[in-house]
Amino acid sequence: MILPRRITGFNVPKGHAEGDPRSFRADCWRVVAPLHGRVEDRPQVLDVRFTSFMTQVLVLPDREVTALLNKVHAWLGFCRPLVPGGCLLKFVDLDPVGSSFAALGRYRVLSRGELERPVTESMCAELGRGELHQLKYWRKLAERGMIRVGDVVFNFWD
């Protein structure tokens, strides 16, 4: 896996189109409605000005999850519901929801295994200098000096 330039949300040029929250929400409904699920509005746990992603809460008959969409690249993942004060995303696999998002042809759906994989130097070949600087800084603060792919794609570093 190669992390594309600007996936971190740092150094994105002004005027660069971000993902559209309305389209994302509509796609969430399109995917969960056939499964007797719904999309719920919840107070934001994280300040969206400082995140590289947008969220939607998906309520399914057997569980609740948060869908995460990177603001720059249409990379999608899922985690347990976000809690105030929480600083670690707990990624999950979510089929058939993930497959349904992939079938829309607009998203790259990342599995839990991909999201939890440690970031390696070779994955960072396309990242910009500012992004690499941020990774170096946050890696020092991370538990055991390890940053996961999901921490880069869906970050709330300020």
Write out the residue ranges for each language-model feature.
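Extended, charge-biased low-complexity segments
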Residues: 1-118
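Acidic, proline/glycine-rich low-complexity IDRs
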Residues: 110-158
